[in-house]
């Protein structure tokens, strides 16, 4: 059996003995998980002896004019106190052992000529081009990488994978929802799942993915790994608190490796057994547990392609110097799409970013005033996927815009975890407000936007897409001069019939969603009074026993 180093155990004891805020407790559990995965999936840049050891901060992320294909791409923690890892290490770790998020040690700089060459690529071609910059051929050879990406997008309904819809008065809507679950998360999760399976096959290992969801993440994660022979997925959903469509998308997948539990509680309550399981480092290591959440670097990497595709579709001409700008409006919750846009911007893509949020406005307050603080409660809105208190990917943005200042990033995030409030330093806030502008929309504005878009274009928006389009309407109504603008649409209106009805419109439900109601469903109840943690542990142990005969997965 592989054990934590003494320093790793000392760290965990300190965490256990401290009086922590809920945010710090949650982060500590995730750090313990990162330690375990880093030990079980060692990479060329790490060793078990270095885990838990205080290291010097890494050099700042540099911009590299030319990128050698044979060069290893390393990833460093935003907090600067963890060993660097390669792509495989970042993929399986999620959080770094010091609690930070992984970012590339170097960013390739894309000049005008490269961008002109890329302008003719399909969306899938852009994903391949970007991934080849950040995943070295020593890990996944180029032909294998291309095959994995083709396989990932093979089940998308639209031949372009994503599609730009050009509407009246300069309204461009980039539809990111043509995957199986009608949400943008299909794009990154299907690729991430292919990368996971590639390494698991190579290492002859098996993992169990545990996901707590309020709706979209669970269904997209299930679809990305359903049927995979070396992955089991356990999803806990809040029974009766998802939309009916979201719940059916999870409970009607009857593959042997998919295990769905309906919890008699809310999203916070169902997180408790998951946190308890991941807090047991030995258990996590023994059963190879991981979670496919929005802080995984692989998901951010794939989402960069949204911004490149939006730019190439909307830029008036690429024959000018400098290249013309395009404004990209990003509706966001956890800020993964926003972080992807900031990285693309840093690499040389001439986009202007607008982040659009609902009344859960922590990102808007951060951009406008440098106020990175929690509200008292999460407000329930029509744009439910954006009802988020903590946009964890802002840590990546702070690190990137501060010039890879891991010391500042660490201080900011640790203060935020302790006090749930921090004022962004003046210089960093200035850089943030230069890179990003922001708007916040109430439910009333969302429904008005959905209605107006239908009346002007006969086009149905989901409430999240409406948050972005409302910004476009504001600008055109004020006759503000602007470059071409592209609004990202993260989900289909078909998933949110309640919001469509609230806007006074008629839902348009596709046949495959209607068919869900006629399918057999399977969902194991977790009732009030049951020991949810023990139920989860028992399920994980049973899955490990089933797979031990198929994989050489017994801990040493």
Model-derived regions: residue spans:
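Hydrophobic alpha-helical signal peptides and transmembrane signal-/tail-anchor segments
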Residues: 34-40
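PLP-dependent amino-acid enzyme catalytic core
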Residues: 8, 40-41, 52, 57-556
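Intrinsic-disorder-associated, low-complexity terminal segments enriched in Asp/Asn/His/Tyr and depleted
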Residues: 9-11, 16-17
